[in-house]
Amino acid sequence: MNMKDANLSSQAAEQSVIRLIVDDATSSGKLCLGVTAVGDITIEGVAESPKTGGVYYHYTLTSSEVIIHGDVTSFNCGTYGDNSIVSLDVSHAVNLKELYCYGNKLTSLDLSKNAALTALECHNNQLTSLDLSHCVSLQKINCIDIQLTSLDVTACSNLIGLRCSRNKELAMLKLPESPLSSLEVQSCKKLKSLHCPSKTLHVLDICGCEALEEVDAKDSKLDFIWVVGCPNLRVVRFDGTALDNEEARRLVDRLPDRRGSVAGELHLFTAEQEEEAVNILGGLPLDAADKNWNISIVPERLWAALRDIQKDVDTLIRPLLERLGRATE
């Protein structure tokens, strides 16, 4: 083997390594792992031969450092008490698609080399930050009950489900224009504003977001909304969601009572015509007014006209303004 081939072989081996460190002080002496890989794997730091195919197996530790060699595509070291992993390095597992590391003692997680990752479950750890800017393939994220202060998932354009509830210090959440269908931010007590640009959102849970003042999920497909325990909520934008009467009534019932303070704004859109919208909503505007909320209803024909205007702006006016701007430079 010449030097070039040796270097390539060494690089390939390095890229197919996962390293983890277990806390000796709290370890049970066992390590639970589930591994799926292309080809064979080896595991250093355990007594038993490796199991693949996703089988969740209890290994006996022979070292606090465990090294997995092989082309791993799915790695599960998640647990609820059995593992005590304090460090996890997956930066050389470039073909990793699924990572389940929940229920450990991780304080950091580097995913900058894991562009192939589609599923991440890192909940119940001690992470204070999570950089997902390189995880462009992510579809499902569960980061419940860690210690995030901010979360930016705008790079995750394929995101379908996001669960980030019980991050009590989370003050900023940036979401992508993705096929997101479910969003859970329950009990994120410092979150003040939430904007969800997804057009496919069906489920929104903001229960217990005590500081939340504004939520914007207009033009989505919402059919389940949970807003209990949001005393500071003042602006709700669900224009274009076409909520039915039953869900609209539940929404109004769950809104906080704003009597004695600035009136709340509830923006709703119905797929029916303006005259029919009044019948569908029934007495909801009055019920909302009793709690000092104003309901703004945008009829379908007006919404369609606004969309046509926006389309004209995008296709005709904006390119013209850009050309004029370049001409004056």
Report each predicted region and the residues it spans:
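C-terminal polymerase-core module
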Residues: 154
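Acidic/charged coordination and interface sites in well-structured regions
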Residues: 88, 109, 130, 151, ...
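Concave beta-strand-loop units of leucine-rich repeat
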Residues: 77-84, 100-105, 121-126, 137, ...
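Conserved, compact domain cores that house catalytic/ligand-binding motifs in diverse enzymes
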Residues: 88-124
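N-terminal capping/linker segments that flank leucine-rich repeat
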Residues: 1-98, 115, 136, 157, ...
